[in-house]
Curated annotation (Swiss-Prot):
It comes from the Eukaryota. It is found in: Secreted; Host cell; Membrane. The gene is CRE9. Belongs to the RxLR effector family. Induction: Expression is induced during host plant infection. The chain crosses the membrane at residues 119-139. Keywords: Membrane, Secreted, Signal, Transmembrane, Transmembrane helix, Virulence. This is RxLR effector protein CRE9. The RxLR-dEER motif acts to carry the protein into the host cell cytoplasm through binding to cell surface phosphatidylinositol-3-phosphate. Residues 1-24 form the signal peptide. A motif (RxLR-dEER) lies at residues 43-61.
């Protein structure tokens, strides 16, 4: 990308954000309007003992569990049951796999670019997953 295009993009972004700041200064201030949002009003919540007797109008419910919290719960359940444990490869197994890959690449050199592309896609997907998990952990 040329530097002039980049500078034009930065200037356009700056101008767009400044317009919203200037329009926010000119907004009329509305006072003494009662919207019925009194802070001192109390909301009725269901008691801990009779939560099943309360109607849905008086009961405060949280939204459903998010995707990541459900996923985190499933992973935790599998880890606690011991299903997630994997065996580590020893040196002999690693050498065997390396030899098999090397013979495949020697037989047909056209397969190496496909293997390389697959590894790049795998790396990108894992990196994106780690970023998403990191952001989710920081937000919660």
């Amino acid at each position: 990308m040329r530097t002039s295009v980049f500078v034009a993009l930065v200037v356009a972004t700056f101008v767009a954000t400044c317009i919203s700041f200037t329009s926010a200064k000119n907004v009329a201030q509305i006072r003494d309007v009662d919207g019925g949002n009194n802070v001192q009003e109390t909301r009725t919540l269901a008691e801990a003992d009779d939560w099943w007797l309360a109607s849905t109008n008086t009961e405060e419910r949280s939204g459903g569990a998010g995707f990541f919290s459900k996923l985190r719960g499933k992973v935790h359940a599998k880890q606690s049951s011991g299903v997630m444990t994997t065996q580590k490869l020893n040196d002999q197994q690693v050498k065997t796999i390396t030899k098999e890959v090397a013979t495949t690449v020697k037989k047909d050199r056209r397969t190496w670019p496909m293997i390389k592309k697959g590894l790049k896609i795998l790396y990108g997907a894992l990196l994106a997953g780690l970023i998403i998990v990191g952001v989710e952990a920081m937000l919660s």
